[in-house]
Amino acid sequence: MAWWSTPYFTTFMENKTYDEKNLRRLQLVELEILKDFIALCEKHKLPYFATGGTAIGALRHQGFIPWDDDIDVCMLRKDYDKFMKIAPEEMGDKYIFMSTDTEKRYPLMFGKMVKKGTRFIEDAYQQGNYPLGIYIDIFPYDRTSEDEKLRKKHQKKTWFWARLQVLTLIPNPNLPPDVTGWKKKAAEWGCKILHVLFKLFHITTQMCTNKYLKWATHCEDDSDLYIDYSYITGENLMIRTRDSFPTVNYQFEDTEVALVKDFDAFLRPEYGDYMQMPPEDERHNHYASFIDFGDGETGN
């Protein structure tokens, strides 16, 4: 497999474990962020739905998966864009809303709602020169083609421009742990050289963002199929609007979170039998090397 087609420069899941007290404190801060996110969505009638471990946690545990350390929610692009415009105006005193529009040093194609005054430094993003606080992820879903060949073309184009965007900002991004030896050295040098060349030829972050959005938001057919182009296996987590909305609320800790109507069709292609607990060596998290909870206490 060519290195450009692998999930470089993304978060690589860890098997490290937190101190139990710190993990629970982290989850409770994230839960606070989620509640504020939901309140704003409900106020402005913006649909959203949980994905990944957050959705599985609601179904299997009625809250966080015991070892999980993040929250993931999704919105259709039009609702995502509206949220990212409204949110800084209404909650900017408490949160930073990071996207490629609001934070020019931010290298990712999805949003983060970050609690001000906190720090959450993942190994994968230590090189990032942007606010690294406790957050929830917000993924935009874009309309995509019913034609598999055309859809895969758009996936390749968006993935390519997303990787280039990272290299306009970070010369030494984290590489997957299974890349070792001469391949790792070659990839490291390749990243540094490309970073320099981009500066010389004025290939900017905004240019890469525009190219990404051109491919992500342009769908030739009148489809009700939607995909998260920022996720490498996004095709496994596609939704159809007719099978997804209106969403249904499920218990999550002391609140409720929205899931797509046909959550099984949504989750099973990516996660298989998600109601079964995975073996211990497959219980991954994002693991932060440093956490500041914003109240003077730190941990990891």
Predicted regions and their residues:
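Conserved oxyanion/phosphate-binding beta-strand-loop segments in alpha/beta enzyme cores
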Residues: A2-T6
